[in-house]
A protein has these predicted regions:
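Helix-start/capping segments and mature chain N-termini
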Residues: 1-75, 96-159
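A short glycine-rich, hydrophobically flanked beta-strand micro-motif that places a catalytic Asp/Glu
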Residues: 87-93, 158-159
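Short secondary-structure junctions
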Residues: 79-88, 152-154
Length: 159
């Protein structure tokens, strides 16, 4: 089974546009959702869509992309998922750093992590670093820092 290369896709003018890393605007991640897709098949995709839509509405309220725009973005992302291979798409709502800039939608088509039959866990003993534990996305950097520290201690993941 092949693994497609990573892609960054920005939603602009009703379509997904491929971005290079150098084209990324500085932004704060407000909400995200990701899932495993194997050969074009995903379990509970509608639940991922609903969780993302709920997070978007909670994060930006009246400024949220209206439902038809969010639905069009979601449909375009699903259509962009390769029919073959192991991918781990992630959808994102971002707030640009530039003053007055509107929130933006982005997708990342990433290779899926390797399957494992076991892994080593490390327990985090400090305070919970998350600021919004009920939302997926805003605390992603904090969670990556925990995982990186756990990996430095010989574990695979932090809990």
């Amino acid at each position: 089974m092949s693994t497609p290369a990573a892609l960054i896709l920005q939603w602009r003018d009703g379509a997904l546009q491929v971005l290079e890393d150098c084209d990324l605007e500085p932004a704060v991640l407000l909400a995200a959702d990701s899932w495993l897709t194997l050969d074009g098949r995903t379990r509970a995709l509608e639940l991922h869509r609903q969780r993302f839509a709920d997070a978007v509405a909670e994060q930006v309220g009246a400024d949220a992309p209206f439902p038809a725009e969010l639905d069009a973005f979601w449909g375009a992302v699903v259509d962009a998922i390769p029919a073959e291979g192991r991918v781990f798409p992630r959808v994102e709502l971002l707030s640009p750093i530039a003053p007055g800039a509107a929130p933006m939608l982005r997708a990342r088509m990433r290779p899926a992590p390797e399957e494992r039959v076991s892994l080593v866990l490390a327990t985090h003993h400090g305070d919970d670093p998350r600021t919004r534990p009920e939302l997926k996305g805003p605390d992603l950097d904090a969670m990556i820092r925990l995982r990186t520290a756990a990996q430095g201690a010989g574990a695979d993941e932090a809990v």
